[in-house]
From Swiss-Prot:
InterPro entries: Homeodomain-like_sf, HTH-type_Tx_Regulator, HTH_TetR, Tet_transcr_reg_TetR-rel_C_sf. Gene3D superfamilies: Tetracycline Repressor, domain 2. One of its GO terms (cellular component) is protein-DNA complex. It holds the Pfam family TetR_N. It comes from Bacillus subtilis (strain 168). The gene is ydgC. One of its GO terms (molecular function) is DNA binding. Coiled coil: none annotated. This is Uncharacterized HTH-type transcriptional regulator YdgC.
């Protein structure tokens, strides 16, 4: 595809993400997508067969990017304790930054997508695998069930994204700091370990 065609396709995808985010899949219209992108309706069909096809592409792209991002966040071997908390903070902040960079795509990919529940299960599984590998490296308590930790992390990220990130109430850095402080240091004052 020529560069003009690539740019046109990107504009249509961006406009579609916004339309689906605002109206939902069923109420979104191809006529509104092309209007937002500055195209005619026939030009839409040069790039996509249907509204379903462009929605599916947006979802597939979001899911694959989330998975790649999650897989890339595995902590490397040889970190000291202080560096582990810094790297965990960086990893959680990176996830929130990703979800914040295209709020329309996040809304449809993480919340409106009929496959969102399965996507989050897949995300939790990749996180669990990362956490178990990091646990074997001695970064986390050996008695923690990393499946539970992964599910908690996904739930926290999902809820905080919907409540604070997509609404603009909090930014990725502050959300990441709160999540990491809770998970790494807990809610009790220093020195009050419950084990």
């Amino acid at each position: 595809m020529k560069s003009k065609g690539v740019e046109s396709r990107k504009r249509l995808l961006k406009a579609a993400a916004n339309e689906f985010s605002v109206r939902g899949f069923h109420d979104a219209k191809v006529s509104e997508i092309v209007k937002k992108a500055g195209f005619t309706q026939p030009s839409f069909y040069l790039y996509f067969q249907s509204k379903e096809a462009i929605f599916a592409e947006l979802i597939t792209d979001f899911h694959s990017r989330v998975r790649k991002l999650t897989e890339s966040l595995l902590l490397e071997n040889g970190l000291n304790t202080e560096d582990v908390s810094k790297r965990v903070l960086l990893a959680v902040e990176t996830v929130f930054q990703f979800l914040d960079e295209d709020k329309d795509l996040t809304k449809i990919g993480f919340f409106l997508n009929p496959e969102a529940k399965q996507m989050k299960k897949d995300l939790a599984m990749v996180l669990k695998e990362n956490l178990e590998a990091e646990q074997r490296l001695g970064y986390f308590h050996s008695e923690l069930d990393m499946e539970t930790v992964a599910e908690c992390l996904v739930g926290m990220i999902e809820h905080l994204t919907e409540s604070f990130l997509l609404t603009g109430i909090k930014d990725p850095a502050s959300l990441a700091a709160e999540v990491v402080n809770l998970l790494i240091y807990g809610m009790l004052p220093k020195g009050n370990d419950v084990r």
